[in-house]
Amino acid sequence: MAAQTQRAVLAGGCFWGMEDLIRRLPGVTATRVGYTGGDVPNATYRNHGTHAEAIEILFDPARTDFRAILEFFFQIHDPSTKNRQGNDIGLSYRSAIYYVDDEQKRIAEDTIADVDASGLWPGKVVTEVEPVGPFWEAEPEHQDYLERYPDGYTCHFPRPGWRLPARAEG
């Protein structure tokens, strides 16, 4: 019997670039962008209060896992800048992991510790780790944005030399 699809919710700056790169990962079966982690019900682009721009990811655990997705997440955005990615500044652009269960929380905390220990970023990770709450899907014009506008704005890029070292087992 095949494993069920699992869900991850991440925020790391403008959701266009995050979605464009993460949706291409092997094992990712669906993505959608939206708003979460804030105070406004039925959030929209024009009124999202303290929500972060985020991406909801569905993935096949037989083909990838939460840790692999997080390692890529930490490669494509700068988790050491608070409320900022590139030219995008503000609470909407914070780095956050919204965990769906205790296992995701543990993996998130372990991965952050490994990123900090690696020295791959100039500062300590400021990524928030919070339980997932309501996810308000963004308007249709924001879904798959860079697929429709390949030369559109992004501040997310794969860093080929960025590889998180394997965790030393103690």
Swiss-Prot record:
GO molecular function term, any single one: peptide-methionine (S)-S-oxide reductase activity
> What InterPro entries does this protein's entry cite?
Met_Sox_Rdtase_MsrA_dom, Met_Sox_Rdtase_MsrA_sf
One of the protein's GO biological processes: protein modification process
The keyword Oxidoreductase is assigned to this record = yes
Q: Which Enzyme Commission numbers does its entry carry?
A: 1.8.4.11
**Enzyme class, first EC level, given as a word:** oxidoreductase
Keywords from the named record: Oxidoreductase
Q: Does the keyword Oxidoreductase apply?
A: yes
Q: Coiled coil located at which positions?
A: none
UniProt-annotated catalytic positions: C14
Catalytic activity entry: L-methionyl-[protein] + [thioredoxin]-disulfide + H2O = L-methionyl-(S)-S-oxide-[protein] + [thioredoxin]-dithiol; [thioredoxin]-disulfide + L-methionine + H2O = L-methionine (S)-S-oxide + [thioredoxin]-dithiol
Family of this protein: Belongs to the MsrA Met sulfoxide reductase family.
What is known about what this protein does? Has an important function as a repair enzyme for proteins that have been inactivated by oxidation. Catalyzes the reversible oxidation-reduction of methionine sulfoxide in proteins to methionine.
**Name of the protein:** Peptide methionine sulfoxide reductase MsrA
What's the source species for this entry?
A: Streptomyces avermitilis (strain ATCC 31267 / DSM 46492 / JCM 5070 / NBRC 14893 / NCIMB 12804 / NRRL 8165 / MA-4680)
The gene coding this protein: msrA
